[in-house]
Amino acid sequence: MLAFVLLFLLLFPVILLGSWLSDSKNKFGLQLAHGAVRTWGFLAFIFMGMPIRVDWQFRPEPGKAYVYCANHFSYFDIAVTGVVVPGLYAFIGKTGVKKLPLFGYMYAKLHILVDRSSPQSRAYSLGKCMRTLAQGRSIVIFPEGGIKAHNPPEMVYPFKDGAFSMAIQQQVPIVPLTLVNNYRILPDGKPFRVHWEPVQVVFHEPISTAGLTQADANTLREQTYRIIESELNKYTAHRSTSSV
């Protein structure tokens, strides 16, 4: 974990510059900041000696916006998705993140924060997500609503509605994203106990929202949940077989 901190401090001036420039209509600032953040994560994983293995069942089209929906069991999830998700994107995160020194400032500038206990904050964040998608920038969201699963890899059921409502409204595809084993590498509640294991990520085929209405949101939500659940179950079954 020390590698993440030291490399972040080294690259923070570049991230900060990109964050400042990202307020303009020119995408240069966003590209600069995202490039620095990806470099940070990529180098940190190299220093940790931990490879990331991505199963590209689908390769996102450059310049196209998607809503990426991933399971969320570990604080490692943000670092991993920050490296593997291509293009320009915005995370949806809790407002508490901005209290973190330096990282919180960067996160608030580049991403979208929401106070889930506040209807006003949820409405504002949803509107900001709509504008982000309309500008051709993807959204990365953890539709469980945080790290709330008590028994990973069993996810919280059901997913929250926001991701699916915004995808339908903007007619943007949903891409289910399975973070297969982060909960074993960095278990929630044990932030400084990293277990070495190659990181496994699966980009599933996109689910089209073309022609869908809000009446289809529940079906879309269920379909996304089952795709991720199936992949997690395959991993669990494989581990059980391997240990016999």
Language-model segments: residues:
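Generic preference for hydrophobic
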Residues: 54, 68, 91, 201-203
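Catalytic core of membrane glycerolipid acyltransferases/transacylases, capturing the structured
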Residues: 18-35, 47, 61-119
